[in-house]
Amino acid sequence: MDIDLVYLWVNGNDPKWQAKRDACIGRPTERQENCKGRYADSGELKYSLRSIEMYAPWIRKIFIVTDDQKPEWLNTENPKIQVVDHKEIMPAESLPCFNSTLIEHYLDKIPGLSEHFLFSNDDMYINQPVTPATFFAADGLPILYMNRKPFRKLALWFRDNVKGKPLSMYLKIIRNAAELVEKYYGTYYGCKPHHNIDSYLKSTITFTNRKFEKEFSPMVPHHVRAADDVQRSVYSYVALAEKKGHLHYVSHKHSFRLHIDNHKLYEKFEQYNPVFFCMNDSEFANDADRKAAIDFLESKFPKKSEFEK
């Protein structure tokens, strides 16, 4: 079974990219959907690729989806690496695009992408050896790692109306995905993504995009994330509804999320020693937090990979 890996990547420090962003959506604010942390690049991809070389060398090809950019350190002559520009897979009316949620709806358009593939953000890392069986079951269907934390309607209503804690943009677009699948299949999946390296069948993404073409069409002109977007968890929910995937709930020993502005979580990381971990930037992180995160990654993955010049 050939298994590829797809990353989304942006260098938010690039003046040319910044000018394009500012002309389209204005300068970044501290609002979550358009904050500096959303586009910050501190070299995380380099360390993620080092973790791939260390723990998942069996991956066939690595596609890096970008907006007319590529990391200066990237060895593009490596036969495993292919840089894909947004305009190769997205419609003209979506460009330029600063909305990762929308970009993720076009992964099946990547030329040469295998049927079985993994998707990762550049802040995801592997911490232990993994095999294809970590991501795909013996029947070839993806293992869908989700968070058991309550995401059902009552829990969301209670949060909104009793606790007075409105849903974040991220949770809103996941809820949109769950409610859309419920509308068509009659089942509401009360689980949500958990910052994993996720597995997919390309055919399921194509099937879902065709099935929900009308519902997805309002997203097309959304250059930045919007509250009525539909998160890519919709592909996992459809896979479950169509019996094209296997649901597994995660624990901190499987996947651990480090908020780089919370240094106490580094101690928790050592306690759990997870298979996967995420170094999550945010609107609350500062340059000192990002330096500490890179120092941590350098200690975990000090060896230069074949993907670097």
Located regions from the model:
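C-terminal catalytic/acceptor-binding lobe
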Residues: 211-309
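Short, flexible helix-coil linker/hinge segments at the edges of structured domains or between repeats
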Residues: 78-92, 130-151
